[in-house]
Protein backbone atom coordinates (compact mmCIF):
# COMPACT_ATOMS: atom_id res chain seq x y z
CA UNK A 1 0.00 0.00 0.00
CA UNK A 2 1.24 3.47 -0.89
CA UNK A 3 1.32 5.88 2.05
CA UNK A 4 2.25 9.55 2.45
CA UNK A 5 4.19 10.27 5.65
CA UNK A 6 6.50 12.98 7.06
CA UNK A 7 10.14 12.74 6.00
CA UNK A 8 12.64 11.14 8.41
CA UNK A 9 16.40 11.47 8.80
CA UNK A 10 16.86 7.94 7.47
CA UNK A 11 15.31 8.97 4.12
CA UNK A 12 18.35 10.94 2.95
CA UNK A 13 19.81 8.15 0.78
CA UNK A 14 16.40 7.56 -0.84
CA UNK A 15 16.07 11.28 -1.57
CA UNK A 16 19.53 11.27 -3.13
CA UNK A 17 18.36 8.50 -5.46
CA UNK A 18 15.27 10.50 -6.38
CA UNK A 19 17.36 13.63 -6.98
CA UNK A 20 19.58 11.72 -9.40
CA UNK A 21 16.52 11.01 -11.58
CA UNK A 22 15.12 14.54 -11.94
CA UNK A 23 17.17 15.50 -15.00
CA UNK A 24 17.87 18.96 -13.59
CA UNK A 25 15.59 21.94 -13.24
CA UNK A 26 14.03 20.88 -9.94
CA UNK A 27 15.85 23.51 -7.91
CA UNK A 28 14.62 22.35 -4.51
CA UNK A 29 15.78 18.74 -4.98
CA UNK A 30 19.52 18.96 -5.74
CA UNK A 31 21.65 15.82 -5.74
CA UNK A 32 23.61 17.13 -2.78
CA UNK A 33 23.52 15.08 0.42
CA UNK A 34 24.39 17.94 2.77
CA UNK A 35 21.62 20.11 1.33
CA UNK A 36 19.05 17.30 1.49
CA UNK A 37 20.05 16.46 5.07
CA UNK A 38 19.62 20.11 6.03
CA UNK A 39 16.21 20.16 4.33
CA UNK A 40 15.12 17.10 6.31
CA UNK A 41 16.40 18.65 9.53
CA UNK A 42 14.48 21.85 8.81
CA UNK A 43 11.29 19.87 8.24
CA UNK A 44 11.73 17.98 11.51
CA UNK A 45 12.33 21.24 13.39
CA UNK A 46 9.21 22.68 11.76
CA UNK A 47 7.11 19.82 13.11
CA UNK A 48 8.73 20.27 16.51
CA UNK A 49 7.83 23.96 16.56
CA UNK A 50 11.43 25.14 16.78
CA UNK A 51 11.53 27.52 13.79
CA UNK A 52 10.04 30.95 13.03
CA UNK A 53 7.42 31.06 10.28
CA UNK A 54 9.94 32.47 7.82
CA UNK A 55 11.97 29.23 7.99
CA UNK A 56 9.21 26.64 8.28
CA UNK A 57 8.82 23.95 5.63
CA UNK A 58 7.17 20.52 5.60
CA UNK A 59 8.51 17.59 3.57
CA UNK A 60 6.60 14.37 2.88
CA UNK A 61 7.53 11.14 1.14
CA UNK A 62 5.49 8.51 -0.69
CA UNK A 63 6.38 5.08 0.66
CA UNK A 64 5.42 1.53 -0.27
CA UNK A 65 4.38 0.26 3.17
CA UNK A 66 5.21 -3.34 2.27
CA UNK A 67 8.78 -2.83 1.07
CA UNK A 68 9.71 0.53 2.62
CA UNK A 69 10.65 1.89 -0.81
CA UNK A 70 10.47 5.68 -1.06
CA UNK A 71 8.89 6.44 -4.43
CA UNK A 72 8.37 10.19 -4.30
CA UNK A 73 8.67 13.47 -2.45
CA UNK A 74 6.52 16.57 -2.01
CA UNK A 75 6.80 19.63 0.22
CA UNK A 76 5.18 22.83 1.43
CA UNK A 77 6.98 26.05 2.32
CA UNK A 78 4.94 27.92 4.92
CA UNK A 79 5.81 31.49 3.89
CA UNK A 80 8.23 32.32 1.07
CA UNK A 81 10.41 35.38 0.80
CA UNK A 82 10.47 36.46 4.44
CA UNK A 83 14.20 35.77 4.84
CA UNK A 84 15.55 35.80 1.28
CA UNK A 85 13.69 37.69 -1.46
CA UNK A 86 11.44 35.46 -3.57
CA UNK A 87 11.69 36.56 -7.19
CA UNK A 88 9.43 36.13 -10.19
CA UNK A 89 9.04 37.96 -13.44
CA UNK A 90 5.58 39.41 -13.96
CA UNK A 91 4.66 39.31 -17.63
CA UNK A 92 3.08 42.69 -18.30
CA UNK A 93 2.79 45.32 -21.00
CA UNK A 94 4.47 48.63 -21.76
CA UNK A 95 2.85 50.90 -24.33
CA UNK A 96 4.87 53.18 -26.61
CA UNK A 97 2.71 55.50 -28.67
CA UNK A 98 2.89 58.68 -30.72
CA UNK A 99 -0.27 60.32 -32.08
CA UNK A 100 1.83 62.58 -34.26
CA UNK A 101 3.48 59.63 -36.00
CA UNK A 102 0.39 57.41 -35.73
CA UNK A 103 2.41 54.74 -33.93
CA UNK A 104 1.07 52.54 -31.15
CA UNK A 105 3.03 49.58 -29.81
CA UNK A 106 1.96 47.46 -26.83
CA UNK A 107 5.07 45.47 -25.92
CA UNK A 108 5.11 42.35 -23.72
CA UNK A 109 7.53 43.10 -20.90
CA UNK A 110 9.08 41.25 -17.95
CA UNK A 111 9.04 43.07 -14.60
CA UNK A 112 11.06 41.77 -11.65
CA UNK A 113 8.61 41.02 -8.85
CA UNK A 114 8.40 40.06 -5.18
CA UNK A 115 4.59 40.01 -5.26
CA UNK A 116 4.25 36.52 -3.76
CA UNK A 117 6.20 37.33 -0.61
CA UNK A 118 4.57 35.63 2.39
CA UNK A 119 2.58 33.11 0.32
CA UNK A 120 2.64 29.41 1.14
CA UNK A 121 4.28 27.37 -1.61
CA UNK A 122 3.76 23.87 -2.96
CA UNK A 123 7.18 22.63 -4.03
CA UNK A 124 9.60 19.74 -4.55
CA UNK A 125 7.09 17.43 -6.22
CA UNK A 126 8.86 14.47 -7.79
CA UNK A 127 7.69 10.90 -8.38
CA UNK A 128 10.13 8.18 -9.40
CA UNK A 129 9.37 7.36 -13.08
CA UNK A 130 9.05 3.67 -12.15
CA UNK A 131 6.12 4.52 -9.86
CA UNK A 132 4.12 6.74 -12.20
CA UNK A 133 1.03 4.55 -12.15
CA UNK A 134 -2.11 3.67 -10.18
CA UNK A 135 -2.84 7.20 -9.01
CA UNK A 136 0.48 7.67 -7.23
CA UNK A 137 1.07 11.08 -8.79
CA UNK A 138 -2.35 12.34 -7.68
CA UNK A 139 -1.80 10.98 -4.16
CA UNK A 140 1.62 12.58 -3.91
CA UNK A 141 0.51 16.00 -5.14
CA UNK A 142 -2.88 16.29 -3.43
CA UNK A 143 -1.87 14.82 -0.06
CA UNK A 144 -0.51 18.28 0.78
CA UNK A 145 -4.01 19.73 0.56
CA UNK A 146 -5.19 17.27 3.22
CA UNK A 147 -2.44 18.48 5.53
CA UNK A 148 -3.26 22.12 4.82
CA UNK A 149 -6.96 21.49 5.43
CA UNK A 150 -6.27 19.76 8.75
CA UNK A 151 -3.84 22.41 9.97
CA UNK A 152 -5.18 25.49 8.18
CA UNK A 153 -3.84 27.94 10.77
CA UNK A 154 -0.25 26.98 9.87
CA UNK A 155 -0.55 28.42 6.35
CA UNK A 156 -1.22 31.71 4.62
CA UNK A 157 -4.22 32.73 2.54
CA UNK A 158 -2.52 32.38 -0.85
CA UNK A 159 -0.80 29.25 -2.16
CA UNK A 160 1.61 29.32 -5.10
CA UNK A 161 3.38 26.63 -7.09
CA UNK A 162 6.31 27.18 -9.45
CA UNK A 163 6.08 24.84 -12.40
CA UNK A 164 9.25 23.51 -14.00
CA UNK A 165 9.93 25.28 -17.28
CA UNK A 166 11.19 23.98 -20.61
CA UNK A 167 14.64 22.37 -20.32
CA UNK A 168 15.99 19.63 -22.57
CA UNK A 169 17.70 16.40 -21.52
CA UNK A 170 21.09 18.12 -21.70
CA UNK A 171 20.08 20.87 -19.26
CA UNK A 172 19.60 23.49 -22.00
CA UNK A 173 17.02 26.15 -21.16
CA UNK A 174 16.05 28.50 -24.04
CA UNK A 175 14.83 31.15 -21.60
CA UNK A 176 18.02 31.05 -19.53
CA UNK A 177 20.21 31.03 -22.62
CA UNK A 178 18.57 34.15 -24.00
CA UNK A 179 18.18 36.11 -20.75
CA UNK A 180 19.66 34.79 -17.51
CA UNK A 181 23.01 33.75 -18.91
CA UNK A 182 23.67 37.30 -20.12
CA UNK A 183 23.50 38.63 -16.56
CA UNK A 184 24.76 35.66 -14.53
CA UNK A 185 27.54 34.48 -16.88
CA UNK A 186 27.05 30.82 -15.99
CA UNK A 187 25.22 27.79 -17.37
CA UNK A 188 21.68 27.05 -16.27
CA UNK A 189 22.75 23.92 -14.39
CA UNK A 190 25.25 25.92 -12.32
CA UNK A 191 22.74 28.62 -11.39
CA UNK A 192 20.15 25.94 -10.64
CA UNK A 193 22.59 24.11 -8.34
CA UNK A 194 23.60 27.28 -6.48
CA UNK A 195 19.98 28.20 -5.90
CA UNK A 196 19.08 24.66 -4.81
CA UNK A 197 21.91 24.53 -2.28
CA UNK A 198 20.84 27.79 -0.65
CA UNK A 199 23.45 30.08 -2.22
CA UNK A 200 20.93 32.66 -3.42
CA UNK A 201 22.75 35.94 -2.75
CA UNK A 202 23.95 36.03 -6.36
CA UNK A 203 20.37 36.42 -7.59
CA UNK A 204 19.84 39.76 -5.86
CA UNK A 205 23.33 40.89 -6.83
CA UNK A 206 23.15 40.05 -10.53
CA UNK A 207 19.46 40.20 -11.49
CA UNK A 208 18.49 42.84 -14.07
CA UNK A 209 16.51 45.46 -12.16
CA UNK A 210 14.86 47.14 -15.15
CA UNK A 211 11.92 45.93 -17.27
CA UNK A 212 12.90 43.63 -20.14
CA UNK A 213 11.09 43.66 -23.48
CA UNK A 214 10.43 40.06 -24.48
CA UNK A 215 10.97 41.01 -28.15
CA UNK A 216 14.66 41.33 -27.30
CA UNK A 217 14.78 37.62 -26.42
CA UNK A 218 15.23 34.87 -29.00
CA UNK A 219 12.03 33.53 -30.54
CA UNK A 220 12.78 30.19 -28.88
CA UNK A 221 12.91 31.91 -25.47
CA UNK A 222 9.71 33.88 -26.12
CA UNK A 223 7.91 30.67 -27.05
CA UNK A 224 8.62 28.98 -23.69
CA UNK A 225 7.49 31.86 -21.44
CA UNK A 226 4.82 30.42 -19.15
CA UNK A 227 5.23 26.92 -20.62
CA UNK A 228 6.01 23.77 -18.61
CA UNK A 229 8.46 20.92 -19.10
CA UNK A 230 6.64 18.03 -20.86
CA UNK A 231 7.03 15.86 -17.75
CA UNK A 232 5.44 18.64 -15.67
CA UNK A 233 2.33 19.04 -17.83
CA UNK A 234 0.35 16.44 -15.82
CA UNK A 235 1.25 18.18 -12.54
CA UNK A 236 0.06 21.49 -13.96
CA UNK A 237 -3.23 19.93 -15.06
CA UNK A 238 -3.73 18.44 -11.58
CA UNK A 239 -3.33 21.83 -9.91
CA UNK A 240 -5.52 23.64 -12.44
CA UNK A 241 -8.35 21.18 -11.78
CA UNK A 242 -7.98 22.02 -8.09
CA UNK A 243 -8.51 25.71 -8.83
CA UNK A 244 -4.98 27.01 -9.45
CA UNK A 245 -4.44 29.54 -12.24
CA UNK A 246 -1.55 31.12 -14.14
CA UNK A 247 -1.61 34.86 -13.42
CA UNK A 248 1.31 35.94 -15.62
CA UNK A 249 4.13 35.25 -13.18
CA UNK A 250 7.07 33.15 -14.35
CA UNK A 251 10.28 31.68 -12.95
CA UNK A 252 13.35 33.90 -13.35
CA UNK A 253 15.53 30.98 -14.43
CA UNK A 254 13.57 28.82 -16.88
CA UNK A 255 10.45 30.91 -17.60
CA UNK A 256 8.09 28.26 -16.22
CA UNK A 257 4.68 29.44 -14.96
CA UNK A 258 3.81 30.17 -11.34
CA UNK A 259 0.29 28.98 -10.51
CA UNK A 260 -1.66 30.42 -7.59
CA UNK A 261 -4.92 30.01 -5.69
CA UNK A 262 -6.55 31.28 -2.50
CA UNK A 263 -6.08 28.43 -0.04
CA UNK A 264 -9.77 28.22 0.89
CA UNK A 265 -10.75 27.93 -2.78
CA UNK A 266 -8.63 24.83 -3.44
CA UNK A 267 -11.16 22.09 -4.22
CA UNK A 268 -9.62 19.33 -2.09
CA UNK A 269 -9.32 21.68 0.89
CA UNK A 270 -12.78 23.20 0.47
CA UNK A 271 -14.60 19.89 -0.03
CA UNK A 272 -12.72 17.70 2.44
CA UNK A 273 -14.59 16.76 5.62
CA UNK A 274 -14.20 14.68 8.75
CA UNK A 275 -15.91 11.29 9.06
CA UNK A 276 -15.79 8.51 11.61
CA UNK A 277 -13.82 5.43 10.64
CA UNK A 278 -14.66 1.80 11.41
CA UNK A 279 -12.88 -1.48 10.77
CA UNK A 280 -14.42 -3.99 8.42
CA UNK A 281 -14.67 -5.08 4.83
CA UNK A 282 -15.37 -2.09 2.58
CA UNK A 283 -18.52 -2.39 0.49
CA UNK A 284 -18.01 -3.51 -3.08
CA UNK A 285 -19.10 -1.18 -5.83
CA UNK A 286 -18.00 1.24 -8.50
CA UNK A 287 -16.72 3.85 -6.06
CA UNK A 288 -14.28 6.65 -6.93
CA UNK A 289 -10.78 6.86 -5.48
CA UNK A 290 -10.66 9.11 -2.42
CA UNK A 291 -7.94 10.66 -0.31
CA UNK A 292 -8.12 9.56 3.32
CA UNK A 293 -5.92 11.27 5.93
CA UNK A 294 -5.57 11.15 9.67
CA UNK A 295 -5.59 14.31 11.80
CA UNK A 296 -2.31 13.56 13.58
CA UNK A 297 0.07 16.50 13.13
CA UNK A 298 3.28 14.66 14.06
CA UNK A 299 2.36 11.31 12.50
CA UNK A 300 0.39 12.49 9.48
CA UNK A 301 -0.61 9.82 6.95
CA UNK A 302 -2.58 9.77 3.69
CA UNK A 303 -3.72 6.78 1.62
CA UNK A 304 -6.04 6.19 -1.31
CA UNK A 305 -9.25 4.22 -0.83
CA UNK A 306 -12.19 3.49 -3.11
CA UNK A 307 -15.30 4.54 -1.26
CA UNK A 308 -18.41 6.69 -1.36
CA UNK A 309 -17.08 10.25 -0.83
CA UNK A 310 -20.42 11.23 0.75
CA UNK A 311 -20.35 8.54 3.44
CA UNK A 312 -20.68 9.52 7.10
CA UNK A 313 -19.00 6.35 8.35
CA UNK A 314 -15.95 5.13 6.47
CA UNK A 315 -15.22 1.40 6.55
CA UNK A 316 -11.52 0.55 6.18
CA UNK A 317 -9.59 -2.70 6.40
CA UNK A 318 -7.23 -3.40 9.29
CA UNK A 319 -4.30 -2.83 6.91
CA UNK A 320 -5.63 0.57 5.86
CA UNK A 321 -6.21 1.60 9.47
CA UNK A 322 -2.69 0.50 10.36
CA UNK A 323 -1.23 2.49 7.44
CA UNK A 324 -3.15 5.56 8.65
CA UNK A 325 -2.09 5.05 12.29
CA UNK A 326 -5.81 5.10 13.14
CA UNK A 327 -8.24 3.07 15.23
CA UNK A 328 -11.94 2.40 14.88
CA UNK A 329 -13.88 5.39 16.15
CA UNK A 330 -11.26 7.94 15.10
CA UNK A 331 -12.16 10.74 12.74
CA UNK A 332 -10.36 10.95 9.40
CA UNK A 333 -10.42 13.52 6.60
CA UNK A 334 -12.04 12.37 3.36
CA UNK A 335 -12.33 13.88 -0.10
CA UNK A 336 -12.76 12.60 -3.61
CA UNK A 337 -9.34 12.30 -5.32
CA UNK A 338 -10.45 14.03 -8.52
CA UNK A 339 -13.20 16.55 -9.12
CA UNK A 340 -16.40 15.11 -10.54
CA UNK A 341 -16.63 15.59 -14.28
CA UNK A 342 -19.53 17.87 -15.14
CA UNK A 343 -22.05 16.26 -17.44
CA UNK A 344 -24.13 18.19 -19.92
From Swiss-Prot:
One Gene Ontology MF term: arginine N-succinyltransferase activity
InterPro entries in UniProt: Acyl_CoA_acyltransferase, Arg_succinylTrfase_AstA/AruG, Arginine_N-succinylTrfase
Keywords: Acyltransferase, Arginine metabolism, Transferase
Catalytic activity: succinyl-CoA + L-arginine = N(2)-succinyl-L-arginine + CoA + H(+)
KW 4Fe-4S (keyword) present: no
This protein's record includes keyword Transferase: yes
Matching Pfam families: AstA (PF04958)
Recorded metabolic or biological pathway in which this protein acts: Amino-acid degradation; L-arginine degradation via AST pathway; L-glutamate and succinate from L-arginine: step 1/5
Active site per the UniProt annotation: 229 (proton donor)
EC number per UniProt: 2.3.1.109
GO biological process assignments: arginine catabolic process to glutamate; arginine catabolic process to succinate
Family to which this protein belongs: Belongs to the arginine N-succinyltransferase family.
Function description: Catalyzes the transfer of succinyl-CoA to arginine to produce N(2)-succinylarginine.
NCBIfam families cross-referenced by the UniProt entry: arg_catab_AOST (TIGR03243), arg_catab_AstA (TIGR03244), PRK10456.1 (NF007770)
Protein name: Arginine N-succinyltransferase
Organism, scientific name: Escherichia coli O139:H28 (strain E24377A / ETEC)
Amino acid sequence: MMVIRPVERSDVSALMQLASKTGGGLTSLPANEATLSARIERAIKTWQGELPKSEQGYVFVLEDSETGTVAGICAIEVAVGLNDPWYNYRVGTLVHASKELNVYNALPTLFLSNDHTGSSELCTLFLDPDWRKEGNGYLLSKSRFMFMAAFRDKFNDKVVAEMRGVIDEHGYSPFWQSLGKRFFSMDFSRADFLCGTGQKAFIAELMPKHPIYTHFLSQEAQDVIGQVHPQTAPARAVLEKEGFRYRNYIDIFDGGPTLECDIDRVRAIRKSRLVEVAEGQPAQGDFPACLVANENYHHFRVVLARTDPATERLILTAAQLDALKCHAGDRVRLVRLCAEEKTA
